[in-house]
Regions:
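Structural/interface elements that position substrates and couple domains in central-metabolism enzymes
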Residues: 1-240
């Protein structure tokens, strides 16, 4: 997707981007204004999708003979839905989703409309975070596995884990944490000195009373969590 209002700019951007991919992705040329709306709308749509599946996960929590991941796997086979970004897990965060959700809400307001769907998505996100926090505060020692906003990244901007760490520290709860990137800890803006860094995820489990698995990474599936309270919304320990 290229946003430009003249052919010279279109050609220049195409020339730059041709070296960044090996395949031939579809190309869509839009005006600058169309591209801006499209970019924000894309993430806003994904936020709605994530919010729905996270709401569904909370509805299914505690039901007998119900595993939400079996349900979403089945629904995701429908081509109208697809399995992408359709998995119950932790609240969305990072640098793009919260920002673009807020931008779309402002865009709608400027057009004299109320983006109620995205406001509800943000409420679902906040409720999901609160439910994780409420479960953690019942324990004196809490382990956080995965502190960046997504796997394979050291970025903690807008990370639910970083907020969880801060809120637990404020409640005088001892926090143990593991992340595959050392840089993730240095990006915590001072919080890294108030937590206990673990070298392995199993060490994090062993030293904690309760564990929150915040990343959907199957390398955590073999963790021994016996006698621990575990928050595993992603279903990592179930092999989902």
């Amino acid at each position: 997707m290229i946003g430009a209002n003249n052919q010279r700019d279109i050609n220049m951007v195409q020339e730059i981007w041709k070296d960044f991919h090996d395949n031939e992705p579809p190309l869509k040329i839009l005006s600058l204004e169309e591209a801006e709306v499209a970019k924000v709308s894309l993430n806003a749509f994904v936020v709605n999708k994530i919010a729905f599946v996270n709401f569904l996960g909370q509805l299914c929590d505690g039901m007998d003979n119900v595993n939400v991941h079996n349900i979403t796997d089945a629904i995701g086979l429908d081509k109208r839905i697809s399995p992408y970004f359709f998995k119950f897990g932790t609240p969305y965060g990072g640098t793009c989703f919260p920002r673009d959700s807020a931008a779309f809400i402002r865009f709608a307001s400027n057009r004299k409309r109320d983006a109620k769907n995205l406001k509800f998505a943000d409420e679902v996100n906040a409720d999901l975070y609160q439910s994780i926090l409420d479960k953690c505060v019942a324990y004196d020692k809490v382990g956080i596995i995965g502190i960046s906003f997504k796997p394979n990244s050291p970025v903690v901007i807008g990370s639910p884990s970083s907020k969880l760490i801060q809120d637990l520290i404020e409640k005088n709860i001892t926090v143990f944490a593991y992340d595959e990137f050392d840089e993730s800890f240095s990006n915590l803006n001072g919080l890294e000195d108030k937590i206990i860094k673990c070298k392995t995820p199993q060490e994090c489990v062993d030293k904690s009373d309760a564990i929150a698995i915040m990343h959907p990474d199957n390398k955590f599936s073999s963790l021994n969590t016996s006698d621990k309270f575990v928050i595993d919304n992603w279903g990592v320990l179930d092999g989902n």
